[in-house]
Design a protein with these regions (language model features):
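Extracellular pro-sequences of secreted precursors
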Residues: 1-37, 69, 401, 405-410, ...
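Structured catalytic cores of large enzymes
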Residues: 5-23, 34-36, 41, 52-199
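Active-site-proximal C-terminal subdomain of hydrolase catalytic domains
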Residues: 51, 92, 266-391
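Catalytic-core segments of thiol-dependent peptidases
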Residues: 72-95, 167-168, 173-278, 283
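Catalytic cores of nucleophile-dependent amide-cleaving enzymes
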Residues: 111-156, 226, 231-317
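Short, non-transmembrane alpha-helical segments in secretory-pathway proteins
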Residues: 418-456
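Exposed beta-strand-loop-beta-strand "reactive/processing" segments of non-cytosolic proteins
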Residues: 447-487
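A short, surface-exposed interaction/processing loop segment used at functional sites
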Residues: 478-503
Length: 503
């Protein structure tokens, strides 16, 4: 089994009626046929239908039950071992898992009590709302969304049909980029773009640019965006001091996006799926991109973080995703490899990095390969083509999945877990942190602290007694600032400052 498309017939029928569901199923049959031509064996499975799930030895999934969906995916992974899981629909069709936000500090700080996430579906660990249990992703998972609350299936049909038509494009068509940044964060964004493309000359800054971008400006097939985003908002904002102008607007994308475009957005709520009725009838930016021909969107469901200079958290996971896409990976493999690299490069995941791992997810068919890669000379011979004509990439893909599964399992077994702690920092550490908070423009009387300890994984290395302290506060312009410090033996080992990408 190469690809498993999970649909919830009852939820789709409730949204779109019997006729709408029939149209969706017809489009899915066409996608299965297109996948077969691409060498991908695809099965569409109705997770709510008792007979279909009984045939797999599993219980059906209730409509809004993330726990049941997680159990079903775990069972299907064990029995069918698909190379790709495609979740069909938004969270009102197939739910996201409401993970507890490890960086939550109350309504005046990081107000996200939960982090809606697809990460648990990519992990072998059983259902939980503790994000620390999902530090070892090993499965390729993506979501082809529809608008929450929709009553007509037109957009979902459009996205399914676009996935059926999609083909890899030459690497040369991805040499240029559309880069957009809040002016306040341009140093960080320029570094990200140099890491991806070797230069950042085309970077657009808000203010004073945007949001009325021309078709030529939006034509590049890679978009990298580092702006402010907001809950249930169809806009991204720039920033310079206290000025927060609109930098990107969903309604202005129509007719301007090149087919096959791939986007990574660091913004808070950058890939949030919401009912358009809650935003004046406007789709979010992520869905608007897909509706206009983009192939994949990698972004966050909640408040995200990164530094104003240098790279960290959202900067890194977005870079890693695009690097793998540009190297010829499928969208889903790029997302999985980005998650694994992000988690694997760290001794431990602090509360902000743990939230980052949980909140970024893929919108798009995970099996699609946007960028074609150059074949080795042997692959061009007649003997090679004859030998692999019926399986194409399947054998090599299976080897890659073995490696990725091993990497994920090793991460899950070895990374220490974050646990809440009531222990205050050592006096010398607290003094330094308070001074840093003050120099960061925060009113120390309004700063909130949350502390943690690290718990060694059962099969991981021993972890010295080590504490993590997170301080959050807002500047006079309302911007949320976070200091994350690592303490060991009363000594300050490491500290970093992060800015919320909106919120």
């Amino acid at each position: 089994m190469d690809k498993l498309i999970l649909r919830h017939g009852a939820a789709l029928k409730s949204k779109y009626g019997t006729a709408g569901l029939a149209r969706i199923d017809a489009a899915l049959r066409a996608l299965v046929t297109a996948d077969r031509r691409r060498g991908i064996d695809t099965l569409v499975l109705s997770v709510d239908e008792a007979a279909a799930m009984k045939a797999q030895g599993l219980a059906p999934v209730a409509r809004t039950d993330a726990k049941s969906l997680k159990a079903a995916i775990d069972g299907l992974a064990g029995k069918l071992a698909p190379h790709y899981f495609l979740l069909l629909g938004a969270q009102d069709v197939l739910p996201l898992v409401p993970l507890v936000n490890p960086a939550y500090t109350g309504d005046d700080g990081d107000a996200d009590k939960t982090v809606p996430s697809d990460l648990p579906y990519a992990c072998e660990a059983p259902y939980s709302t503790d994000p620390a249990r999902f530090q070892g992703p090993s499965r390729v998972v993506g979501r082809l969304p529809d608008p929450p609350g929709a009553s007509k299936p037109d957009l979902l049909l459009q996205l399914i049909r676009a996935a059926a038509r999609a083909e890899p494009l030459p690497r040369e068509q991805f040499h240029t980029f559309f880069g957009l940044s809040a002016a306040q964060w341009q140093a960080s964004t320029r570094l990200s773009l140099r890491n991806l493309f070797g230069q950042a000359e085309q970077l657009k800054l808000a203010p004073s640019q945007g949001p009325r971008w021309s078709k030529a400006e939006l034509a590049p097939r890679v978009h990298f965006i580092n702006c402010h985003g907001g809950d249930t908002s169809p806009e991204y904002l720039g920033q310079h001091g206290d000025d927060y102008p609109v930098a990107h607007r969903a309604s202005l994308l129509r007719g301007r996006i090149s087919a096959g475009t791939v986007i990574a957005a660091e913004c808070c709520y950058g890939a949030q799926l919401y009912d358009p009725k809650d935003a004046g009838g406007h789709l979010g930016i992520a869905l608007s991109y897909l509706a206009d021909g983009a192939t994949g969107f990698f972004g966050s469901t909640t408040i995200a973080y990164g530094p104003s200079e240098g790279n960290g958290s959202a900067d890194l996971i977005c870079q890693y995703f695009l690097q793998r896409v540009l190297a010829g990976a499928s969208l889903g493999r790029a997302a999985l490899e980005a998650r694994q690299r992000f988690a694997g490069e760290r001794t431990h995941l602090d509360p902000v990095d743990l939230k980052t791992l949980a909140q970024f997810y893929l919108l798009g068919d995970p099996s699609l390969q946007p960028v074609g890669f150059a074949s080795h000379a042997l692959a061009k011979t007649r003997a090679f083509k004859a030998a692999f004509a019926k399986v194409q990439d399947r054998g090599v893909r299976g080897l890659r999945r073995e490696r990725l599964e091993r990497e994920g399992l090793n991460l899950g077994r070895s990374l220490p877990r974050l646990r809440d702690s009531q222990q205050a920092p050592a006096a010398s550490v607290e003094k330094v942190l308070r001074a840093m908070a003050k120099e960061s423009g925060l009113d120390i009387r309004q700063v909130r602290r949350r502390s943690y300890v690290l718990q060694a994984a059962k099969q991981g290395p021993k972890v010295p007694a080590r504490s993590i302290h997170m301080l959050k506060g807002r500047r006079t312009n309302g911007q949320l600032i976070t200091l994350v410090a690592t303490e060991q033996g009363g000594e300050l080992l490491h500290v970093r400052r992060l800015h919320a990408r909106g919120g």
